[in-house]
Amino acid sequence: MCTSIVEVVGADGAGKGGDGWFDLTHPVVSYDHPHHALLEEAITIDFVNAALGPGARVAVELTLESAKELSAALARAIAAAEIEESARLRQRR
């Protein structure tokens, strides 16, 4: 079943592909048939820089449960990073 679930957001960072590191422009998050993982459906995250061609891509295919765990881990890390950033800003004042 094709779900047509696709989310695209801008990104400022870097990814490491087969040819080394490259600047990221955006990740594409989808829920559909995976290309490699032996799953019926998967959350797929493609970190890309379209201007650099198809080699500038890092792809991840996750089970829905693994994606939920990753999302929760990201939320915890972001919350902790925001506390660190706030403390750093207070020290500069």
Segments predicted by a language model, with ranges:
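Positively charged, low-complexity terminal tracts
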Residues: 1-93
